[in-house]
Amino acid sequence: MAKDEDNSRVHLLDLPWEDVLVPHILSYLPLRHILSLQRVSKPFHSLVHIYLCNCRHFDSTQLGPQLPKTTFSELLKNNTVLQKLDLQSCSDWLTDKELLPIIGQNHHLTYINLNSCGQLTRQSLVAISLSCPHLQNICLGHCDWVDCLSMRSLADHCKCLEAIDLTACRQLKDDAISYLVQKSTRLKSLSLAVNANISDIAVEETAKSCRDLEHLDLTGCLRVKNDSIRTLAEYCNNLKSLKVKHCHNVTESSLGNLRKREVVLDVEPPLQRALVLLQDVVGFAPFINLQI
C-alpha cells in the first residue's frame, strides 16, 4: 500500500520542464535562488541549464557585485533569446571579451544597461548597434568610452530607440547628440547630464526632432541657456519632467511656462528657493503672506 501511494505522488520535476517549470515557476524566482538549485541534484542542474538557455531577462544585480566573470560567461553562453540585459553590477571587470559573444548571439535585445562599465570600448557599442535592431532602451551612463563614431553607429542602426542615458559621456558634443536625435525621433527619455560640452544647439535639435519627448535630464550642462528651454517648451508638448539643476544660465523666465504646464522640475521657484536658503541661514522660515 505504501509503495502504491509513493508511486502515485507527483514530484516537482515530474511537471513539464519547458512548458510549466521554466516559464511559470522559475521565471518568478530570484536568479541567485535558481542558481542554488543546481547543487540539489543532477536533474535540477539540468533544469537550471534549460532555464538559462531560455531566460528572457538577465539582471546581474540579483547576484550581487561578486559575480565572477567566468561564471557570467558560463551562465549565458547558450542563450540566444535574451530581451533584457542588465550588467551594471559587472562594471568592475566587464570587458569586450565577455560582452561581445553575448551580444553577437542575442538579436532580440530591447533593453541593455551598461551603467559605469568603464572597461568596455566603442567596439561593444558598435556590436550592439549591428546586432540589436530592436533595441529600445540603453543605459550608457558614466561610460567615458562612448564617442561620436559609436554613437552614430547606434543612431544609424537602432531605429526603435525610446530611452537613452548618456550621463557623463563627456566625449559627446553637440554634433553627436544632434545626429542621434535626428535619427531617433521616437525618443521619450534622454539624459545628457554632467556634460559641459552640451549647449543650446543639442537641446534645440532634440526639441525639434523628438516631439514625443517626456523626460530630459540636463543636470550640470553648464552651457545650456534659456533659449533652448523655451524651444523645448514650444515643441515638446508631452514633456513630463525636466532636470536643470546646476544649469546656472537657465532661469525662471524660461521655466515659468513649463511650471504652469505642471512639468516636474528639479529646481524650486525663486521665492521658495529664497525661503529655503533663508531657513538654512537663520534656522527657521519666516511667515510671509503671499496674498498681499
Swiss-Prot record:
GO terms for cellular component: cytoplasm; SCF ubiquitin ligase complex. LRR repeats lie at residues 134-155, 160-181, 186-207, 212-233, 238-259. SMART domains: LRR_CC. Residues 12-59 form the F-box domain. It is found in: Cytoplasm. Pfam families: F-box. Its main location: cytoplasm. Pathway: Protein modification; protein ubiquitination. InterPro entries: F-box-like_dom_sf, F-box_dom, Leu-rich_rpt_Cys-con_subtyp, LRR_dom_sf. Keywords: Cytoplasm, Leucine-rich repeat, Repeat, Ubl conjugation pathway. CDD domains: F-box_FBXL15. Gene3D superfamilies: Ribonuclease Inhibitor. GO terms for biological process: bone mineralization; dorsal/ventral pattern formation; G2/M transition of mitotic cell cycle; positive regulation of BMP signaling pathway; protein ubiquitination; SCF-dependent proteasomal ubiquitin-dependent protein catabolic process. Substrate recognition component of a SCF (SKP1-CUL1-F-box protein) E3 ubiquitin-protein ligase complex which mediates the ubiquitination and subsequent proteasomal degradation of target proteins. Acts as a positive regulator of the BMP signaling pathway. Required for dorsal/ventral pattern formation. Belongs to the FBXL15 family. Part of the SCF (SKP1-CUL1-F-box) E3 ubiquitin-protein ligase complex SCF(FBXL15). This is F-box/LRR-repeat protein 15. It comes from Xenopus laevis. The lineage of its organism: Eukaryota, Metazoa, Chordata, Craniata, Vertebrata.
